[in-house]
Amino acid sequence: MKITWLGQAGLLFDNGKVKIMVDPYLSNSVEKVEPLNYRRVPVKEEFLSVSPDVMIFTHDHLDHYDPETAPIFLERKEKRMTVLSPSSVWQKARAFKAHNNVQFNRGTSWTEYGFRFTAVKAEHSDVHAIGVIIEDLMENKVYYITGDTLYNNRIFGDLPEKIDVIFLPINGVGNNMNETDAVRFFRACGARWAVPYHIGMFDGKTTDIFDDENKITLEIYKEREL
C-alpha cells in the first residue's frame, strides 16, 4: 500500500486500484478562526485533483472536515464516492447527493473495494469523533487511524488483535495525546509500527519527540510503501 501524508491528519492510501482519502485539510480555513493557527506547510494543489473511491472524515473540526477542502471533492459528480463519516459530519456531507454518504458511527463496519472499514471509539471534544480500522482484505494488512483522541482505556476494547500500522496524533493540544501518551498508547494497542502525525501544520514540532524504535516517519506529500 502506498501512503501519502497530506499534512495534519490527512492521509491518502493508494494500492494502484483503489484510493482512500482521510481528513484532507488543503486550505487555510483554520487561520480565519484562530489566527495563530496558520499553515506552516503550503498546500500542494495536485492533491485537490485526486479522485478518491472512498473518503473518510473522522469528525467535525475544521482541520478534518474542512468547509473549504471537502466541497472540492464532494461537489464532483463524474464519479460516485463512498463517504464515511460520523453523525456530526454526515449531517453536512449528505447535502452533496452525488455520493453514497454512509453514517459511520462507532461500531459500524463497511466493506467495499476489497477493504473493510470499522469505526472505533475516539476520546475527543467532538463526541461523535471516531477512529478508523482499515483492513486490506487482499493483503491481510490492518491500518488503524486513531483520529483525534486522548489516551482512554475504553478504546482498546474496540480494536482488533492484529494492527500492522497505527497513525496517531502527538501534538498534545485540542484534546489530543501528547508524545508521551502516544507512545504509551502505541505499546498498549500492540501495533507493529507507529506513524506519529498531526504536527507541523500549526506548530514547529517534529516526529523526533515520539521516542520508540518502531516509529515510521512520513514526510508531508511524499509517498511511502507501508
Q: Where are the model-predicted features located?
A:
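Active-site environment of divalent metal-dependent phosphoester hydrolases
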Residues: 9, 28-29, 61-65, 90-93, ...
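Pre-active-site segment of Zn-dependent metallo-hydrolases
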Residues: 18-56, 60, 67-72, 149-161
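Conserved beta-strand hairpin/beta-sheet module of binuclear metal-dependent hydrolase folds
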Residues: 1-45, 128-147, 165
